[in-house]
A protein has these predicted regions:
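DNA transaction DNA-binding modules
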Residues: 272-374
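Core recognition of P-loop NTPase motor domains used across DNA-transaction enzymes
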Residues: 2-75, 87, 130, 138-141, ...
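Conserved inter-motif catalytic segment of the P-loop NTP-binding fold
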Residues: 46, 56, 64-65, 69-70, ...
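Phosphate-binding/switch region of NTP-binding enzymes
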Residues: 80-82, 86, 90-91, 119, ...
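Post-Walker A helix-loop "phosphate-sensing" segment adjacent to the P-loop in P-loop NTPases
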Residues: 99-113, 347
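Pre-Walker A (Motif I) flank of P-loop NTPase domains
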Residues: 75-79, 114
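Conserved RecA-like P-loop NTPase ATPase core
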Residues: 74, 97, 118, 177, ...
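Hydrophobic positions on the alpha1 helix immediately C-terminal to the Walker A/P-loop
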Residues: 92, 96
Length: 374
């Protein structure tokens, strides 16, 4: 494996600590009403008030793709990043934030550029300046913002983040460092229910806006056979999250760390990293196993060949689409269902957005090439 990380590294500009909220967001942000990643059952009137969808409805619906922030590593949703105090979490957060803001590969992983907000709630601006200038030099990037104070989850954090998203609709990643700083004071009253509730609230927000919330947290002192059992608190934190990263060292003074990764939208991984003490960045040393990739899908391959930068769009009926797909011999209704359930892969692997809607004249399919480099 090779290290694709580029070496030209600008620094970061500093944003204000707080943003004003508004009753209505008027930007092009797609909210929960039409871009909720989680399954939204259609409301039905019945005696029991349970909203359901049939398997037929499930297959006939196109759900928006879950966008990668870092391919095979980090996606939209809510993730935990957990490690012991002073293990190097904040250096990793700064490194990740910079790479996403600049769109530079993180080691061998492709990164999708976007605005980043880093809530460095255990730091001050002077410390951030020293750390970041040592890591990235003094050239600036306008896509990376910092705040050292924020409200708690129950006291208006969501309004603050909404205000930032309103001003920066291309935001892709928000880092909260640390979870404890945005929790209500609970002491020993924390429970599975309260742990699950706070992450669920954060996840609801990230799903509503299609962004990634990466929440930094600490491990507990007690060792465990399963590294994910070392997350401080109860299993409610991991149970509600979309995934988690656990950073561990054998000894605090070691330069080498293991990064265990688990998630709903990416394969489980164990990476070996080495800390460069001169530049204060984490370097990739290797992975325990190579990532398993789905084999090519002949249908998606045929669809991808239809579009090009010169002809980035196509729309028509499913029957017309079948006529364009040489070598594909299935019924039109089966074609649309296969594309419905493959919309996520079609977007993330081929850069093609797939839409399907029914009009008074029948069903219409639209294909749009949004990223020819996918």
């Amino acid at each position: 494996m090779t290290d694709n990380r580029k070496t030209t590294v600008p620094g970061a500009s500093v944003g204000a600590d707080a943003v004003q909220s508004s009753d209505k967001i008027t930007t092009n942000i797609i909210t929960n009403s039409d871009k909720q990643i989680n399954l939204q059952a259609a409301k039905k009137s019945n005696n029991f008030g349970l909203n359901t969808v049939s398997m037929t409805e499930l297959y006939d619906t196109v759900y928006p793709p879950r966008r990668p922030i870092v391919n095979d590593l980090l996606y939209s949703g809510t993730y935990l990043f957990v490690g012991a105090p002073k293990v190097g979490k904040s250096f990793f957060m700064g490194q990740l934030a910079y790479h996403v803001a600049m769109g530079l590969p993180l080691w061998e992983y492709e990164v999708h550029q976007g605005t980043v907000l880093y809530l460095a709630l255990e730091d001050d601006y002077a410390r951030l300046q020293r750390r970041l200038s040592r890591m990235f030099g003094v050239e600036e990037t306008s896509n990376l913002y910092f705040a050292t104070q924020a409200k708690s989850v129950s006291k208006g954090l969501d309004q603050q983040l909404e205000g930032f998203i309103r001003e920066h609709p291309d935001v892709r990643l928000i880092i909260i460092d640390t979870l404890q700083k945005v929790r209500e004071i609970g002491g020993d009253r924390y429970s599975y229910a309260s742990d699950y509730e706070i992450v669920t609230k954060l996840k609801t927000f990230s799903d509503r806006y299609g962004i990634c919330l990466l929440v930094v947290h600490h491990t507990r002192k007690m060792e465990a056979e399963d590294s994910f059992d070392m997350i401080s608190g109860t299993n409610g934190l991991l149970g509600a999250a979309d995934g988690a990263f656990i950073m561990q060292k054998k000894r605090r003074t070691d330069n080498t760390a293991l990064l265990d990764i688990v998630g709903r939208d990416q394969p489980d991984q164990e990476l070996t990293l080495e800390f460069d003490r001169e530049r204060c960045v984490w370097e990739f040393q290797g992975a325990e196993t190579e990532l398993w990739k789905l084999p090519p899908d002949p249908l998606l391959e045929a669809v991808a060949k239809m579009l090009s930068p010169e002809q980035p769009e196509w729309s028509g009926t499913p029957t017309e689409l079948l006529e364009r797909l040489s070598g594909v011999s299935i019924q039109a209704n089966i074609l649309t269902r296969k594309l419905n359930v493959s919309a996520d892969r079609l977007y993330n692997d081929y850069g093609i957005r797939y839409e399907s809607k029914r009009t008074h004249e029948g069903r219409v399919v639209k294909l749009t090439l949004e990223n020819s480099g996918a």
